[in-house]
From Swiss-Prot:
InterPro entries: AlgH-like (IPR003774). GO terms for cellular component: cytosol. Gene3D superfamilies: VC0467-like. This is UPF0301 protein Sala_0165. It comes from Sphingopyxis alaskensis (strain DSM 13593 / LMG 18877 / RB2256). SUPFAM superfamilies: VC0467-like (SSF143456).
Length: 187
């Protein structure tokens, strides 16, 4: 029997303990795209120490009224100087892409100007870099128990403090993350 592949666009990937790559320990990744050509996601649980949205806007010469002290997240190891804004669907400016009818992602300065001027989306987060997988790579990592997939909620994505996102995402999926282990028991 031939079964259709399962794609994870619009869902959250949660790193399982012992994933084998320290860059992804306790990662929560919002999946932007996943299909036969590979996958792309943005990490939403690892703030870059000392970097705020206001500081990024200052570096880009974009004026802003509010201090914008929200953290900038490490989106992943691929293209770490490339910025992304993951945001609610109530803003659809230049280059905004709808992700699985759930949220949107933008990477233009247009959205940063809108945020700086207070006319951007109602909910958003900014990340640098992304996580990328070649065709079949993510599926292989799933077989090796590297990731858990969950729908996640908008509240988890935008409202939960970053230090709690990994554990909270597992809790939303009905899993107590404290009980996860990399070691098997003996019967």
């Amino acid at each position: 029997m031939d079964t259709a592949p399962t794609w994870f666009t619009g869902q959250l990937l949660l790193a399982l303990p012992g994933i084998g790559d320290p860059r992804f320990e306790h990662s929560v990744i919002a999946m932007i795209s996943h299909d036969e050509d590979g996958a792309m996601g943005i990490g939403i649980a690892d703030p870059i120490e000392g970097m705020t949205v206001g500081a990024v806007l200052d570096q880009l010469g974009i004026e802003h009224e509010a201090p914008l002290d929200q953290p900038v997240y490490l989106g992943g190891p691929v293209e770490p100087s490339r910025g992304f804004v993951l945001h609610s669907r109530d803003w659809g400016g230049e280059g905004a892409v709808l992700v699985a009818d759930r949220w949107m992602v933008s990477s233009s300065h247009d959205i940063l100007r809108a945020i700086g001027e207070g006319r951007g989306p109602s909910r958003w987060l900014v990340a640098l870099g992304y996580a990328g997988w070649s065709p079949g790579q993510l599926e292989g990592e799933m077989v090796r128990h590297g990731w858990h997939v969950t729908p996640g909620s908008d509240a988890l994505l935008f409202d939960t403090p970053p230090a709690r996102r990994w554990q909270a995402a597992f809790a939303e999926a009905g899993v107590d993350a404290r009980l996860l282990t990399t070691k098997g028991g003996e019967a």
